[in-house]
């Protein structure tokens, strides 16, 4: 069986990885300009296909049958070729509902605010309505409720983002701040790249129930497989594929004192895990055309930190990397937020007597090193998801990190 995904821009899609992880059929990504959609619908090369932005409504007139849920939502994201024409379905409903259930988010009796008024907003509205929401309000750029009068919705209890704001490569932006919603107790964001958007990061910092969109993507793909080939993919298999993909795309971030071995451990971990390792100090040196000590000497620490922030935030946007940071990178809260968006942070601990002080502009003596550790240790500890002792060999430390990642929560 030959299946595909059609859309306008699919360069960063995870759909091929997800569908082929189920092992039921081949799956291709087909980027199409709008004027080619009609020809694709009539071409019988693919037995079934998914549809993403901006064609979920475009394909509907070509379908001889549209399922009740697709009619209710007003969009089709799954099409199957049959003997009597194209049949259209919507599996986003199942995916969104599954994401909310996994996060323990219940809509019954809740005041729900949905950011965005596009096709995915319709899906969120349908799920929240069927779940018994007390009130559902849609926020758009020019509607009665817009981003300039969010204070009118301060009683929001469940916030849902269906806009692309905060999606790669524009990580770090958010359609709204949770500061506007003091009574908010749950957040859902359909964006899956990065794993944790700025909005989800705000929810995590407040201890609010939340979920990014990757689980929705996997769950809706599983439901699509049901229509493609009558496959019944259960929750355990959905969880397996979700977890495997999340671990693969998540960055491994190493933080800690200057000279604690982050770069060396990253290189060993790269060999063990088959991932690319990058060092943010090296990225700074490449962009500046001079060494870190030279940057400090000629331009001072402030300029170095500016270059470092660019390097850290650029690397943090990517997926599946091992990122060895400079000792002071996490002093900037913006860097920490960027790294956490798509990564798991490990605090690499090492006895101060074992630290290398070569070419370390800010830790040239034991006295300055002790003061630095006293100031930075709480910062490293607070930003890290796990702490790993690096007093043994770099190979053993790398193996510890690999093992911890495999057993970590997503």
What are these regions (language model features)?
Residues 145-210, 329-335:
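Rossmann-like adenosine-cofactor binding region
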Residues 279-340:
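ATP-dependent small-molecule kinase phosphotransfer cores
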Residues 2-103, 194-196, 200-202, 206-209, ...:
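Phosphate/diphosphate ligand-binding glycine-rich loop within oxidoreductases
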Residues 191-250, 390:
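Adenosine-phosphate binding glycine-rich loop
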Residues 262:
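Conserved lysine of the Walker
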Residues 239-245, 268, 272, 344, ...:
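NTP-dependent small-molecule kinase module
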Residues 7, 90-93, 100, 109-129, ...:
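Glycine-rich adenosine-cofactor-binding loop
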Residues 341-379, 386:
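A glycine- and Lys/Arg-enriched "phosphate-lid" helix/loop adjacent to the NTP-binding pocket
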